[in-house]
């Protein structure tokens, strides 16, 4: 075999290697980001001391399910917005249904509760810190997701930044569930959502500058 033929064959083989898909990129970004958020939570907040008992409570899993569904919906939005011309018809439903479901549970809880208990169900004991802590834990996830998104082709940078921030906030909220003692549906439906919307708002601001072609 001639040297020129060998070089041509090797070049053709190298060109056949496919770049990672968008789903693979984001899976890796979420994995690394979630690991960073978990380490941050363990270093600064620690796992709640009664986690074993909390795992037996249905409302704990409702809380985890809510933020996990929002993370899945946000990932769907991120994948759609990373492709030029991709349809986003189902994005509002993917993001809105988990929120509406939690708000329905929260409304039922408040209606059934005694008037004196409603304030505690909404504010809990950690309303001042909860949104800020979720936003703090979202930083590693947000950085990883935003880095992956920059390598793709979002054509609506502000909306893409919002979706990236919401995904980061939702993944951070899943991690925060291991620390947070709150189980009231009204608390989760408002303060958790606020914590996830903080990085989403930051994503809107950063998207126009960092994700523009």
Curated annotation (Swiss-Prot):
Superkingdom to which the source organism belongs: Bacteria
Recorded phenotype for the gene knockout or disruption: Growth not inhibited by chlorite during aerobic growth, slight reduction in lag-phase when grown on minimal medium with lactate and chlorite. Up-regulation of the SigF regulon (Dsui_0156 to Dsui_0159).
Keywords: Cell inner membrane, Cell membrane, Membrane, Stress response, Transcription, Transcription regulation, Transmembrane, Transmembrane helix
Pfam families: NrsF
Induction comment from the UniProt entry of this chain: Part of the SigF regulon, induced by chlorite (HClO(2)) under control of SigF. Part of the probable sigF-nrsF operon.
GO annotation, cellular component aspect: plasma membrane
Topology of the protein relative to the lipid bilayer: Multi-pass membrane protein
Main subcellular location: membrane
Entry's transmembrane regions: 27-47, 51-71, 91-111, 126-146, 159-179, 187-207
Localization per record: Cell inner membrane
Family (UniProt): Belongs to the NrsF anti-sigma-F factor family.
Function noted in UniProt: Probably an anti-sigma factor for extracytoplasmic function (ECF) sigma factor sigma-F (SigF), which responds to (hypo)chlorite. ECF sigma factors are held in an inactive form by a cognate anti-sigma factor.
Protein name as it appears in the record: Probable anti-sigma-F factor NrsF
Species: Azospira oryzae (strain ATCC BAA-33 / DSM 13638 / PS)
Organism placement in taxonomy: Bacteria, Pseudomonadati, Pseudomonadota, Betaproteobacteria, Rhodocyclales
